[in-house]
Amino acid sequence: MSSAIVVSQDAESLGLQIYSRKEKSLGVLVSNFLRLYNRDDVDLIGLDDAAGQLGVERRRIYDVVNILESIGIVARRGKNQYSWKGFGEIPRSLDELKEEGMRERLGYSSSNNSDKVSNGCEREEPLTLTPDDQENSSSSKMDQKKEKSLWLLAQNFVKMFLCSDDDLITLDSAAKALLSDSPDSVHMRTKVRRLYDIANVFASMNLIEKTHIPVTRKPAYRWLGSKSIAERGLSLFNSGEPKRVFGTEITNLRAKRNKTYCSSIRKQIGYKKHDEENTEQESKPAASKYVFGPFSPIGASKTNNDKVGKGRLLEIEALASTYQPQYCNQEITGLLGHFTEAWKKWYAEVDRNK
Protein backbone atom coordinates (compact mmCIF):
# COMPACT_ATOMS: atom_id res chain seq x y z
CA MET A 1 0.00 0.00 0.00
CA SER A 2 2.83 2.37 0.90
CA SER A 3 4.66 1.64 -2.37
CA ALA A 4 1.55 2.55 -4.34
CA ILE A 5 1.38 5.88 -2.51
CA VAL A 6 5.05 6.59 -3.31
CA VAL A 7 4.50 5.82 -7.00
CA SER A 8 1.46 8.11 -7.06
CA GLN A 9 3.45 10.95 -5.46
CA ASP A 10 6.31 10.50 -7.96
CA ALA A 11 3.88 10.64 -10.87
CA GLU A 12 2.26 13.81 -9.52
CA SER A 13 5.66 15.49 -8.98
CA LEU A 14 6.56 14.83 -12.64
CA GLY A 15 3.23 16.20 -13.88
CA LEU A 16 2.17 12.78 -15.21
CA GLN A 17 -1.39 11.59 -15.49
CA ILE A 18 -2.34 8.82 -13.06
CA TYR A 19 -2.69 5.80 -15.35
CA SER A 20 -5.52 3.28 -15.13
CA ARG A 21 -5.71 0.44 -17.63
CA LYS A 22 -9.51 0.42 -17.56
CA GLU A 23 -9.87 4.18 -18.02
CA LYS A 24 -6.86 5.27 -20.08
CA SER A 25 -5.54 4.14 -23.44
CA LEU A 26 -2.04 2.98 -24.28
CA GLY A 27 -1.46 6.39 -25.87
CA VAL A 28 -1.64 8.08 -22.46
CA LEU A 29 0.89 5.62 -21.03
CA VAL A 30 3.26 6.31 -23.93
CA SER A 31 2.91 10.07 -23.42
CA ASN A 32 3.79 9.66 -19.74
CA PHE A 33 6.71 7.41 -20.65
CA LEU A 34 8.09 9.98 -23.08
CA ARG A 35 7.70 12.84 -20.59
CA LEU A 36 9.61 10.76 -18.07
CA TYR A 37 12.59 9.85 -20.28
CA ASN A 38 12.77 12.57 -22.93
CA ARG A 39 15.80 14.23 -21.32
CA ASP A 40 19.40 14.74 -22.30
CA ASP A 41 20.72 12.90 -19.23
CA VAL A 42 18.85 9.66 -20.00
CA ASP A 43 20.88 6.91 -21.65
CA LEU A 44 19.59 3.60 -20.26
CA ILE A 45 15.98 2.73 -19.40
CA GLY A 46 15.16 -0.09 -16.99
CA LEU A 47 11.74 -1.58 -17.60
CA ASP A 48 11.24 -2.46 -13.93
CA ASP A 49 12.09 1.11 -12.93
CA ALA A 50 9.76 2.52 -15.59
CA ALA A 51 6.92 0.26 -14.46
CA GLY A 52 7.43 1.35 -10.85
CA GLN A 53 7.51 5.07 -11.63
CA LEU A 54 4.49 4.92 -13.92
CA GLY A 55 2.54 2.55 -11.68
CA VAL A 56 1.78 -0.12 -14.30
CA GLU A 57 2.69 -3.73 -14.89
CA ARG A 58 5.91 -4.53 -16.68
CA ARG A 59 4.08 -6.16 -19.58
CA ARG A 60 2.49 -2.80 -20.35
CA ILE A 61 5.95 -1.22 -20.50
CA TYR A 62 6.91 -3.99 -22.93
CA ASP A 63 4.09 -2.81 -25.19
CA VAL A 64 5.38 0.76 -24.99
CA VAL A 65 9.02 0.06 -25.76
CA ASN A 66 8.21 -2.34 -28.61
CA ILE A 67 6.07 0.27 -30.37
CA LEU A 68 8.67 2.98 -29.78
CA GLU A 69 11.44 0.66 -30.95
CA SER A 70 9.63 0.12 -34.24
CA ILE A 71 10.34 3.76 -35.19
CA GLY A 72 13.77 4.06 -33.57
CA ILE A 73 13.09 6.06 -30.40
CA VAL A 74 14.52 3.31 -28.19
CA ALA A 75 16.74 0.28 -28.88
CA ARG A 76 17.06 -2.96 -26.96
CA ARG A 77 20.36 -3.26 -25.06
CA GLY A 78 19.82 -6.22 -22.72
CA LYS A 79 17.30 -8.05 -20.64
CA ASN A 80 14.69 -5.54 -19.47
CA GLN A 81 16.96 -2.69 -20.57
CA TYR A 82 16.62 -0.26 -23.47
CA SER A 83 18.79 2.61 -24.60
CA TRP A 84 17.19 5.98 -25.30
CA LYS A 85 17.79 7.22 -28.87
CA GLY A 86 15.38 10.16 -28.96
CA PHE A 87 13.11 11.74 -31.54
CA GLY A 88 16.02 12.60 -33.80
CA GLU A 89 16.26 8.94 -34.85
CA ILE A 90 12.70 8.84 -36.23
CA PRO A 91 13.41 10.30 -39.72
CA ARG A 92 16.26 7.85 -40.33
CA SER A 93 14.17 4.90 -39.14
CA LEU A 94 11.26 5.92 -41.35
CA ASP A 95 13.54 6.16 -44.38
CA GLU A 96 14.78 2.64 -43.72
CA LEU A 97 11.22 1.35 -43.30
CA LYS A 98 10.18 2.98 -46.56
CA GLU A 99 13.06 1.40 -48.47
CA GLU A 100 12.30 -1.98 -46.93
CA GLY A 101 8.61 -1.62 -47.71
CA MET A 102 9.28 -0.74 -51.34
CA ARG A 103 11.52 -3.80 -51.70
CA GLU A 104 8.80 -5.98 -50.21
CA ARG A 105 6.26 -4.62 -52.66
CA LEU A 106 8.59 -5.54 -55.52
CA GLY A 107 8.90 -9.08 -54.18
CA TYR A 108 12.53 -8.87 -53.03
CA SER A 109 11.78 -9.62 -49.38
CA SER A 110 13.30 -12.86 -48.18
CA SER A 111 10.52 -13.62 -45.70
CA ASN A 112 6.79 -13.18 -45.36
CA ASN A 113 6.11 -10.65 -42.64
CA SER A 114 2.41 -11.39 -42.45
CA ASP A 115 3.18 -15.00 -41.48
CA LYS A 116 5.50 -13.71 -38.78
CA VAL A 117 2.78 -11.47 -37.44
CA SER A 118 0.27 -14.30 -37.44
CA ASN A 119 2.56 -16.85 -35.80
CA GLY A 120 4.08 -14.38 -33.32
CA CYS A 121 7.71 -15.37 -33.85
CA GLU A 122 10.27 -14.36 -31.26
CA ARG A 123 12.75 -11.60 -32.08
CA GLU A 124 15.53 -12.98 -29.92
CA GLU A 125 16.71 -16.14 -28.19
CA PRO A 126 14.83 -17.28 -25.05
CA LEU A 127 16.07 -15.57 -21.92
CA THR A 128 16.93 -17.41 -18.70
CA LEU A 129 14.47 -16.59 -15.93
CA THR A 130 15.68 -15.55 -12.50
CA PRO A 131 14.20 -17.15 -9.35
CA ASP A 132 12.06 -14.07 -8.82
CA ASP A 133 10.53 -14.56 -12.27
CA GLN A 134 9.80 -18.29 -11.92
CA GLU A 135 6.29 -17.69 -10.64
CA ASN A 136 5.57 -15.44 -13.63
CA SER A 137 7.23 -17.72 -16.18
CA SER A 138 4.05 -18.37 -18.13
CA SER A 139 3.24 -14.67 -18.53
CA SER A 140 6.88 -13.91 -19.42
CA LYS A 141 6.82 -16.49 -22.20
CA MET A 142 3.66 -14.95 -23.58
CA ASP A 143 5.26 -11.51 -23.47
CA GLN A 144 8.30 -12.76 -25.38
CA LYS A 145 6.11 -14.55 -27.89
CA LYS A 146 4.04 -11.50 -28.76
CA GLU A 147 7.04 -9.13 -28.56
CA LYS A 148 8.01 -9.83 -32.15
CA SER A 149 4.38 -9.65 -33.21
CA LEU A 150 3.78 -6.18 -31.74
CA TRP A 151 7.10 -4.75 -32.92
CA LEU A 152 6.62 -6.10 -36.45
CA LEU A 153 2.95 -5.15 -36.58
CA ALA A 154 3.86 -1.54 -35.69
CA GLN A 155 6.53 -1.43 -38.40
CA ASN A 156 4.21 -2.88 -41.04
CA PHE A 157 1.51 -0.38 -40.06
CA VAL A 158 3.96 2.47 -40.67
CA LYS A 159 5.04 0.94 -43.98
CA MET A 160 1.44 1.08 -45.20
CA PHE A 161 1.51 4.87 -44.96
CA LEU A 162 5.02 5.25 -46.33
CA CYS A 163 4.50 3.00 -49.37
CA SER A 164 0.86 3.78 -50.16
CA ASP A 165 -0.56 6.48 -52.40
CA ASP A 166 -3.78 6.68 -50.37
CA ASP A 167 -4.23 9.77 -48.23
CA LEU A 168 -6.42 7.97 -45.69
CA ILE A 169 -6.16 4.42 -44.38
CA THR A 170 -8.95 2.80 -42.37
CA LEU A 171 -8.32 0.39 -39.55
CA ASP A 172 -10.32 -2.31 -41.35
CA SER A 173 -8.20 -2.09 -44.48
CA ALA A 174 -5.02 -2.14 -42.39
CA ALA A 175 -6.21 -5.22 -40.51
CA LYS A 176 -7.01 -7.06 -43.74
CA ALA A 177 -3.64 -6.19 -45.24
CA LEU A 178 -1.48 -6.86 -42.18
CA LEU A 179 -3.23 -9.71 -40.36
CA SER A 180 -3.51 -13.12 -42.00
CA ASP A 181 -6.85 -14.87 -41.87
CA SER A 182 -7.27 -16.91 -38.73
CA PRO A 183 -10.02 -19.45 -37.96
CA ASP A 184 -9.91 -18.30 -34.34
CA SER A 185 -12.14 -15.22 -34.18
CA VAL A 186 -10.99 -14.39 -30.65
CA HIS A 187 -7.35 -14.37 -31.78
CA MET A 188 -8.25 -12.14 -34.71
CA ARG A 189 -10.09 -9.65 -32.51
CA THR A 190 -7.08 -9.53 -30.21
CA LYS A 191 -4.82 -8.66 -33.15
CA VAL A 192 -7.19 -5.92 -34.26
CA ARG A 193 -7.14 -4.43 -30.76
CA ARG A 194 -3.35 -4.47 -30.83
CA LEU A 195 -3.42 -2.63 -34.13
CA TYR A 196 -5.82 -0.09 -32.63
CA ASP A 197 -3.41 0.41 -29.69
CA ILE A 198 -0.55 1.02 -32.12
CA ALA A 199 -2.62 3.59 -34.01
CA ASN A 200 -3.46 5.40 -30.75
CA VAL A 201 0.21 5.56 -29.79
CA PHE A 202 1.27 7.03 -33.13
CA ALA A 203 -1.65 9.48 -33.01
CA SER A 204 -0.58 10.68 -29.54
CA MET A 205 2.87 11.37 -30.99
CA ASN A 206 1.44 13.33 -33.96
CA LEU A 207 2.87 10.83 -36.40
CA ILE A 208 -0.63 10.12 -37.72
CA GLU A 209 -3.96 11.88 -37.32
CA LYS A 210 -7.29 10.26 -36.56
CA THR A 211 -10.05 11.38 -38.93
CA HIS A 212 -12.86 9.81 -41.00
CA ILE A 213 -13.75 8.98 -44.59
CA PRO A 214 -15.85 11.88 -45.98
CA VAL A 215 -18.47 9.67 -47.67
CA THR A 216 -18.86 6.70 -45.35
CA ARG A 217 -17.81 8.50 -42.14
CA LYS A 218 -15.76 5.45 -41.21
CA PRO A 219 -12.80 6.07 -38.86
CA ALA A 220 -9.52 6.48 -40.69
CA TYR A 221 -5.97 7.74 -40.17
CA ARG A 222 -3.95 10.32 -42.09
CA TRP A 223 -0.16 10.33 -42.23
CA LEU A 224 1.42 13.51 -40.83
CA GLY A 225 5.03 12.50 -41.36
CA SER A 226 8.33 13.25 -39.68
CA LYS A 227 9.12 16.65 -41.17
CA SER A 228 9.37 18.30 -37.77
CA ILE A 229 8.64 15.44 -35.38
CA ALA A 230 12.03 15.82 -33.70
CA GLU A 231 11.22 19.44 -32.79
CA ARG A 232 7.63 18.61 -31.86
CA GLY A 233 8.84 15.91 -29.49
CA LEU A 234 10.76 18.44 -27.43
CA SER A 235 7.64 20.53 -26.91
CA LEU A 236 5.01 17.80 -26.64
CA PHE A 237 6.73 15.48 -24.18
CA ASN A 238 8.77 17.66 -21.87
CA SER A 239 8.25 17.96 -18.12
CA GLY A 240 8.31 21.77 -18.01
CA GLU A 241 5.38 24.14 -18.02
CA PRO A 242 3.70 24.59 -21.41
CA LYS A 243 4.53 27.80 -23.21
CA ARG A 244 1.86 30.27 -24.24
CA VAL A 245 0.70 29.63 -27.77
CA PHE A 246 1.27 32.58 -30.09
CA GLY A 247 -1.88 34.66 -30.46
CA THR A 248 -3.50 33.82 -27.13
CA GLU A 249 -4.89 36.73 -25.15
CA ILE A 250 -3.01 37.82 -22.04
CA THR A 251 -4.47 41.33 -21.67
CA ASN A 252 -6.76 40.34 -18.82
CA LEU A 253 -3.86 38.99 -16.79
CA ARG A 254 -1.87 42.21 -17.21
CA ALA A 255 -4.93 44.32 -16.43
CA LYS A 256 -5.42 42.47 -13.15
CA ARG A 257 -1.74 42.87 -12.31
CA ASN A 258 -1.86 46.63 -13.02
CA LYS A 259 -5.06 46.97 -11.05
CA THR A 260 -3.42 45.46 -7.98
CA TYR A 261 -0.38 47.69 -8.43
CA CYS A 262 -2.52 50.82 -8.73
CA SER A 263 -4.41 49.95 -5.55
CA SER A 264 -1.20 49.66 -3.57
CA ILE A 265 0.08 53.02 -4.91
CA ARG A 266 -3.15 54.73 -4.00
CA LYS A 267 -2.74 53.52 -0.42
CA GLN A 268 0.86 54.77 -0.30
CA ILE A 269 0.07 58.33 -1.40
CA GLY A 270 -3.12 58.50 0.65
CA TYR A 271 -5.37 59.05 -2.30
CA LYS A 272 -9.02 59.71 -1.37
CA LYS A 273 -12.02 60.68 -3.36
CA HIS A 274 -13.51 63.06 -0.76
CA ASP A 275 -13.79 63.40 2.96
CA GLU A 276 -17.16 62.45 4.31
CA GLU A 277 -17.60 65.91 5.78
CA ASN A 278 -16.82 67.68 2.51
CA THR A 279 -19.16 65.38 0.65
CA GLU A 280 -21.95 66.06 3.10
CA GLN A 281 -21.38 69.80 2.85
CA GLU A 282 -21.46 69.73 -0.94
CA SER A 283 -24.54 67.54 -1.17
CA LYS A 284 -26.50 69.22 1.63
CA PRO A 285 -25.81 72.99 1.71
CA ALA A 286 -27.68 75.20 4.17
CA ALA A 287 -30.99 76.57 2.87
CA SER A 288 -30.12 80.08 4.10
CA LYS A 289 -27.25 80.31 1.60
CA TYR A 290 -29.56 80.23 -1.42
CA VAL A 291 -31.39 83.17 -2.94
CA PHE A 292 -34.69 81.78 -4.16
CA GLY A 293 -35.24 84.49 -6.73
CA PRO A 294 -32.56 83.67 -9.33
CA PHE A 295 -31.85 80.25 -7.67
CA SER A 296 -28.10 80.83 -7.46
CA PRO A 297 -25.67 80.06 -4.57
CA ILE A 298 -24.09 82.91 -2.61
CA GLY A 299 -20.40 83.84 -2.57
CA ALA A 300 -19.59 82.04 0.70
CA SER A 301 -20.30 78.67 -0.92
CA LYS A 302 -18.06 79.58 -3.86
CA THR A 303 -15.11 80.14 -1.52
CA ASN A 304 -15.63 76.72 0.07
CA ASN A 305 -15.82 75.04 -3.34
CA ASP A 306 -12.55 76.74 -4.39
CA LYS A 307 -10.77 75.16 -1.42
CA VAL A 308 -12.16 71.76 -2.26
CA GLY A 309 -11.14 72.20 -5.92
CA LYS A 310 -7.56 73.07 -4.94
CA GLY A 311 -7.38 69.95 -2.78
CA ARG A 312 -8.58 67.78 -5.64
CA LEU A 313 -6.07 69.35 -8.01
CA LEU A 314 -3.20 68.65 -5.64
CA GLU A 315 -4.27 65.03 -5.31
CA ILE A 316 -4.50 64.68 -9.10
CA GLU A 317 -1.03 66.18 -9.55
CA ALA A 318 0.41 63.82 -6.94
CA LEU A 319 -1.23 60.88 -8.65
CA ALA A 320 0.00 62.00 -12.07
CA SER A 321 3.57 62.39 -10.83
CA THR A 322 3.47 58.90 -9.31
CA TYR A 323 2.17 57.26 -12.50
CA GLN A 324 4.29 59.29 -14.89
CA PRO A 325 5.41 56.70 -17.48
CA GLN A 326 9.10 56.37 -18.24
CA TYR A 327 9.06 56.76 -22.02
CA CYS A 328 12.18 56.02 -23.98
CA ASN A 329 11.11 58.29 -26.85
CA GLN A 330 12.63 61.71 -26.24
CA GLU A 331 10.10 63.49 -28.45
CA ILE A 332 7.14 62.12 -26.51
CA THR A 333 8.87 62.93 -23.23
CA GLY A 334 9.41 66.53 -24.35
CA LEU A 335 5.79 66.81 -25.48
CA LEU A 336 4.53 65.62 -22.11
CA GLY A 337 6.85 68.09 -20.39
CA HIS A 338 5.43 70.89 -22.56
CA PHE A 339 1.87 70.02 -21.50
CA THR A 340 2.94 69.89 -17.86
CA GLU A 341 4.51 73.35 -18.01
CA ALA A 342 1.44 74.75 -19.81
CA TRP A 343 -0.82 73.30 -17.13
CA LYS A 344 1.24 74.88 -14.33
CA LYS A 345 1.25 78.28 -16.05
CA TRP A 346 -2.50 78.13 -16.64
CA TYR A 347 -3.15 77.19 -13.03
CA ALA A 348 -0.88 80.00 -11.74
CA GLU A 349 -2.64 82.53 -13.99
CA VAL A 350 -6.07 81.43 -12.78
CA ASP A 351 -4.89 81.68 -9.18
CA ARG A 352 -3.65 85.27 -9.74
CA ASN A 353 -6.95 86.37 -11.34
CA LYS A 354 -9.04 85.29 -8.36
From Swiss-Prot:
Q: Where does this protein chiefly localize?
A: nucleus
Query: Quick one: a GO biological-process term for this protein?
Result: regulation of transcription by RNA polymerase II
> Which residue ranges hold the DNA-binding region?
21-86, 145-225
Q: Kindly list the GO molecular function terms attached to this UniProt entry.
A: DNA binding; DNA-binding transcription factor activity; RNA polymerase II cis-regulatory region sequence-specific DNA binding
Annotated stretches, region: Disordered? 104-143
What residue ranges carry the coiled-coil annotation?
none
Q: Name one cellular component (GO) term.
A: nucleus
Please state where this protein is localized.
Answer: Nucleus; Cytoplasm
Q: Which InterPro entries match?
A: E2F (IPR015633), E2F_WHTH_DNA-bd_dom (IPR003316), WH-like_DNA-bd_sf (IPR036388), WH_DNA-bd_sf (IPR036390)
Regarding tissue, the record states: High expression in young cotyledons and leaves, hypocotyls, shoot apical meristem, roots and mature pollen grains, moderate in developing trichomes, flowers and at early stages of developing anthers, and barely detectable in mature leaves. Not detected in primary root meristem, emerging lateral roots, pistils, developing embryos and siliques.
Q: Keywords on this record?
A: Cell cycle, Cytoplasm, DNA-binding, Nucleus, Repressor, Transcription, Transcription regulation
**Pfam families tied to this protein:** E2F_TDP
Which domain of life does the UniProt lineage start with? Answer: Eukaryota
Residue ranges annotated as compositionally biased, kind Polar residues, are 108-117
Belongs to which family? Belongs to the E2F/DP family.
What is the recorded function of this protein according to its Swiss-Prot or TrEMBL entry?
Inhibitor of E2F-dependent activation of gene expression. Binds specifically the E2 recognition site without interacting with DP proteins and prevents transcription activation by E2F/DP heterodimers. Does not bind retinoblastoma-related proteins. Acts as a growth regulator but is not associated with changes in the expression of cell cycle marker genes or in nuclear ploidy levels. Has no effect on cell proliferation, but may repress cell wall biosynthesis genes during cell elongation in differentiated cells.
Protein name listed in UniProt: E2F transcription factor-like E2FF
Q: Which organism is it from?
A: Arabidopsis thaliana (Mouse-ear cress)
